[in-house]
Amino acid sequence: SNTRNFVLRDEEGNEHGVFTGKQPRQAALKAANRGDGTKSNPDVIRLRERGTKKVHVFKAWKEMVEAPKNRPDWMPEKISKPFVKKEKIEKIE
């Protein structure tokens, strides 16, 4: 399996939380679902790929959307859907 680990960093470079995904975007979506960003005021998510000096920077937010018609019983009618938009890649020295 080629799952990659992405570590969530804050502005100070402290790292908390690992999100997995085959692509940085996948990990960013998982992180976005935990944040409080909105479309007008998105969170900034910085994910460093484990074992590299690359930090993927995303803008992230959630929107309430209608759940799919064939949703399981436990799923509410409205669900929050994460969105991410890649901003840039930073290199750590």
From Swiss-Prot:
Classification via Pfam families: MC1
Region listing for Disordered, in residue ranges: 1-43
GO MF: DNA binding
Keyword list, A-Z: DNA-binding
BP term (GO), one: DNA protection
The keyword Ion transport appears for this protein: no
Known function: Protects DNA against thermal denaturation and modulates transcription.
UniProt-recorded name of the protein: Chromosomal protein MC1
Taxonomic classification: Archaea, Methanobacteriati, Methanobacteriota, Stenosarchaea group, Methanomicrobia
